[in-house]
Amino acid sequence: MSCRVIPSSTDFTRNLYTATLVCVISFATFQVSQSLYRHILRNSRNRHRIMSSSSASSSSKNDAESLRCNRILSSKLYLDVPTSKVPLIYSPTYDISFLGVEKLHPFDSSKWGRICGFLIAARVLDKKCIVEPLEASKNDLLVVHTEQYLNSLKNSTKVAEIIEVPPVALFPNCLLQQKVLYPFRNQVGGTILAAKLAKERGWAINVGGGFHHCSGGKGGGFCAYADISLCIHFAFVRLNISRVMIIDLDAHQGNGHEMDFARDSRVYILDMFNPEIYPFDYEARRYIDQKVEVVSGTTTNVYLKKLEEALEVAIGTFDPELIVYNAGTDILDGDSLGRLKISPDGITTRDEKVFSFARERNIPIVMLTSGGYMKSSARVIADSIVNLSKKRLIDTTKP
């Protein structure tokens, strides 16, 4: 005989609650697992996207470096210079003559030829011994410059802005290419070649160049091409050099090369400049390894003492395989743009100190003439080179 047990209402309620709780927990677990799955999937996709982006960025960077290297290796600017020539580089194409318009800028655009003329007259240099460079091609310029920047130079207004002569904007660009930019490109070729000659002979002087306000993507201050940056990149690839010191003693801050080599540990920048004048580039100042400020009115003795101290600090911090010396003469007393009070003899002593610094440590040195806005600059530069020759810091005689 069977007996059926009828559950009490309490048991029924408990069972219903338990079943409901199980359903809720199961549903919640399902929702959490679904959410977790979506989160993992989304993170996986993001990770893949980031890795793909990073990989693409790395690949793009490697491609750009490879292209830069190929451009440098295919360049014709590294001429084989016979030993009958001295490592002093100049071409008559350096000088700018443009219907008198060049006189609207305070820069002496014929100083380069006048420097060589003084050296020849002083019998320190034989005209036949001067090295003539090639013009930097577009492919050469693309080693540092962007295509966009080079294309911007096809606009006369842009060129006028860079060389700071507003009326030039009214001229056809083809004229500016021939009369202004062509001379600049020849000087760029000279600066690039100077590094090769310095490595071979111990020193080289480009009687031109030093366009230190121009970076890869921006020109200004009478500087249309970044010859210093180009020179250094060529040296990295063609000369197997890995450490370069820039000693920039122009009165103005060298903001162009500072931006190009921002955070590049291969390049040490010593920049001694007047902070009260153009270009007021505070971002670029962050990338100067040793900043030496010389305010308006600084005199010769004070200047030379600061230079001596700066050179000692530099060599104690960095061991260069090449020095690029930007030897602007706009520090001369009377130069309205530099606003310093350095005597002509002070310039001679300054250059001697820098060349002695390089010679004592057996470091190849490239000298660029850079800025200088007085007619007397050409004579001062020539006299300084004569002094370097007399002190046997350079040899301008034929072998």
Where do the language-model regions lie?
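A general "terminal functional-core" signal
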Residues: 2-43, 47-54, 59-68, 75-84, ...
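Short glycine-rich His-centered loop
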Residues: 85-105
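Short internal beta-strands
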Residues: 89-91, 131, 271-273
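Short catalytic helix/loop segments, enriched in acidic residues and glycine
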Residues: 105-121, 350
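Short, glycine/charge-rich beta-strand/loop segments that flank catalytic centers
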Residues: 131-140, 207-211
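Charged, often glycine-rich, active-site loop that binds/positions anionic groups
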Residues: 134-159
